[in-house]
Amino acid sequence: EAAGLISFPRV
């Protein structure tokens, strides 16, 4: 979802 903030890998 929050790809606009920082690139979090959803684990």
Swiss-Prot record:
Keywords linked to the UniProt accession: Amidation, Neuropeptide, Secreted
Localization (cell): Secreted
GO cellular component: extracellular region
Pfam family, one: Periviscerokin
Residues with PTM Valine amide: V11
Main location: secreted
Superkingdom of origin organism: Eukaryota
One GO term of the biological process aspect: neuropeptide signaling pathway
Function of the protein: Mediates visceral muscle contractile activity (myotropic activity).
Family statement drawn from the similarity comment of this UniProt entry: Belongs to the periviscerokinin family.
Protein's recorded name: CAPA-Periviscerokinin-1
Species name: Striatophasma naukluftense (Gladiator)
